[in-house]
Amino acid sequence: MRLLTTLLVSSCFVASAAAQSGSVAVKAAKIMRADGSVIEQGTLVIENGRITSIGGSDVEVPFDVLLNEYPTAVVFPGFFEAHSNSGMDRANENVPLAPFLNVKDSIDPVSFYFEDELRGGTVAIGVIPGNNTVIGGRGRVVAPAGMTIEQMTLSDDMGMKIAIGPKGGWSRSSQLAELREAVDKLNLDLREIGENLTYDGVVREDRKKAGIEEDADVADGDMWDSAAGYIRFGDDFTGKGLISEEDLDDTQRGMVDILNGDERLWVYAPSA
């Protein structure tokens, strides 16, 4: 019964914190802090999804905060699942390169996985796809509570994953070869794009000198930045400084973000 009470207290915390809103206070027989110290007859106050006070029975509870009392319970920090591809409608993609994917579009907030994790005392999960790809999509850190992905999200910049453990039917060497080929292809594509942009610039300049008016550039309203200078990694090449996000496709943008150092990158290796 004591364990059940403890888990119920944990669930109460997460449900509040996951939504990043709401307030709750808990008084319990013991509160175990992250450093291992124990507070007897402790009080914990959470406001707007964040712990604001922790201490003994003398901690002041704001008048507008719901107080829950568990005189026999032990409150302790929840667990953090650092790496998981559960809780999604599809944990992996068949394509080897998928940096254009975002786990936001795949997480199922009502999956029983999140309910089971919450009951077990887990308060944060790093959900990231891609064990069966070479480069997977973007992950995020979520709490196992909330009715929408926005309510669940604790951090949306977990980064992407490179898997060097071979997927079914592949060897490790073929997995790494696919990664090298992807980088080589990107570099070739960028050089071709740079040359085309350089040529287009020369044509526009010639037309301008000839007195031919060009149509003014009109913003297309998409999310991609049209400013030049997007490529910051690697050696210089013709037209490198002219390339913008808008000149690339989704896969190329994801690869460039990795090589530019704009994405946190994790390496998945099932064995050393």
Identify the role of each PLM range.
Residues 37, 56, 79, 90-93, ...:
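Short, solvent-exposed loop/turn and secondary-structure capping segments
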Residues 86, 107, 130-134:
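Acidic, glycine-rich active-site loops and adjacent beta-strand->loop/helix elements
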Residues 118-272:
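Polyanionic/metal-chelating signatures
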